C-alpha cells in the first residue's frame, strides 16, 4: 500500500511541474 502512495506522490509532483512550465511558458503549438 505504501508503494502505491509513493507512486501517486511521484506522478502528482511530475504533473504539477508539467503544468507549472506549461502555463508559465505557453507552447507555440497552442497559439496556432
UniProtKB/Swiss-Prot annotation:
Positions in coiled-coil regions: none
Main location: plastid
Subcellular location as annotated: Plastid, Chloroplast thylakoid membrane
GO BP term, example: photosynthesis
Membrane-topology annotation of the record: Single-pass membrane protein
Domain of life, per lineage: Eukaryota
Keyword Transmembrane: yes
GO cellular component: chloroplast thylakoid membrane; photosystem II reaction center
Transmembrane regions listed in the UniProt entry: 3-23
Record key words, sorted: Chloroplast, Membrane, Photosynthesis, Photosystem II, Plastid, Thylakoid, Transmembrane, Transmembrane helix
Family: Belongs to the PsbT family.
Assembly, per entry: PSII is composed of 1 copy each of membrane proteins PsbA, PsbB, PsbC, PsbD, PsbE, PsbF, PsbH, PsbI, PsbJ, PsbK, PsbL, PsbM, PsbT, PsbY, PsbZ, Psb30/Ycf12, at least 3 peripheral proteins of the oxygen-evolving complex and a large number of cofactors. It forms dimeric complexes.
General function of this protein: Found at the monomer-monomer interface of the photosystem II (PS II) dimer, plays a role in assembly and dimerization of PSII. PSII is a light-driven water plastoquinone oxidoreductase, using light energy to abstract electrons from H(2)O, generating a proton gradient subsequently used for ATP formation.
Record's protein name: Photosystem II reaction center protein T
Organism: Cyanidium caldarium (Red alga)
Amino acid at each position: 500500500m505504501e508503494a502505491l502512495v509513493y507512486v501517486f506522490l511521484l506522478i502528482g509532483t511530475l504533473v504539477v511541474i508539467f503544468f507549472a512550465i506549461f502555463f508559465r511558458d505557453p507552447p507555440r503549438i497552442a497559439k496556432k
